[in-house]
């Protein structure tokens, strides 16, 4: 009953102009039809269970990656405007803004970024095979040219242990372990240098939701951070108390010339000195 109430409320908010996305299909259907007011496009997302439905609700109906909240400040130019201007500068220079989606789950976040930044190049990572296949299905259903890897992200390439805490398909974790071959891990640096791009790309955004893996990711090899003007991360001290999973991230970001803004479950880390636009160097 709760999801029907949420669905009805979301329709009312869309009608009065307060929401960007509209879920057209009733919640019980496995094939969900959506509409995006901003791009004037409809799209499809297949769901397996309630966990998928709530994931979509967070991404689209709560619009959790929106930058619109950054307009409420005292500066003449908002951070949202700066980021959008930088995105437009990249495309005007003939490059594609590179977005790396670490922890794509069912593909909803990658679809969101594709709709919001349609001229971008998106690399999506997901450790769980069932989530990876679901994500692949949803991306193909919308004919999106997004590269999706059945890998996890880490500070360096390697392998890790797959961990299912029993909290549903949006809570799978991986712990780096050289003796394990459960999950293949790839670093941000390797993604940038080793993946073959048909187009010229330049760093733009990294989204990180890796269920505590941020502790290892931000432990070393962090030079890539300065190249990405926008990081969006969900931290997980609440999920793994007394394990200081967010400590390395907080230490790293505090040393950078970046703003640090909380919204909902996510932290938005925004550069105060946007990097020079350049094509990624493969050497």
Regions found by a protein language model. Name each.
Residues 1-283:
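Phosphate/nucleotide-binding beta-alpha loop and adjacent structural elements of enzyme active sites
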């Amino acid at each position: 009953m709760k999801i029907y109430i949420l669905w009805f409320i979301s329709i009312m908010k869309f009608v009065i102009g307060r929401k960007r996305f509209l879920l057209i299909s009733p919640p019980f259907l496995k094939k969900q039809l959506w509409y995006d007011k901003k791009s004037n496009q409809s799209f499809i997302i297949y769901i397996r269970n309630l966990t998928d439905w709530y994931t979509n609700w967070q991404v689209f109906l709560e619009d959790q990656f929106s930058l619109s909240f950054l307009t409420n400040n005292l500066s003449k130019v908002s951070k949202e405007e700066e980021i959008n201007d930088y995105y437009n500068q990249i495309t005007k220079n003939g490059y594609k803004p590179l977005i790396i989606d670490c922890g794509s789950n069912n593909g909803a976040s990658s679809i969101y970024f594709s709709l919001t930044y349609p001229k971008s190049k998106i690399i999506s990572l997901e450790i769980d095979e069932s989530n990876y296949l679901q994500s692949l299905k949803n991306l193909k259903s919308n004919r999106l040219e997004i590269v999706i890897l059945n890998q996890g992200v880490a500070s360096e390439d390697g392998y890790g242990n797959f961990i299912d805490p029993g909290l549903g398909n949006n809570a799978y974790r991986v712990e780096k372990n050289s003796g394990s071959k459960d999950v293949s891990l790839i670093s941000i640096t390797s993604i940038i240098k080793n993946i073959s791009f048909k187009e010229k790309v330049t760093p733009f955004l990294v989204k990180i939701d890796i269920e505590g893996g941020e502790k290892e990711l931000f432990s070393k090899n962090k030079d890539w951070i300065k190249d990405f003007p926008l990081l969006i991360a969900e931290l997980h001290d609440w999920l793994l108390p007394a394990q200081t999973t967010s400590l390395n991230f907080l230490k790293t970001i505090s040393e950078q010339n970046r703003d640090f803004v909380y919204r909902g479950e996510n932290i938005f880390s925004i550069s105060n000195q946007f990097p020079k636009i350049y094509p990624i160097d493969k050497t």
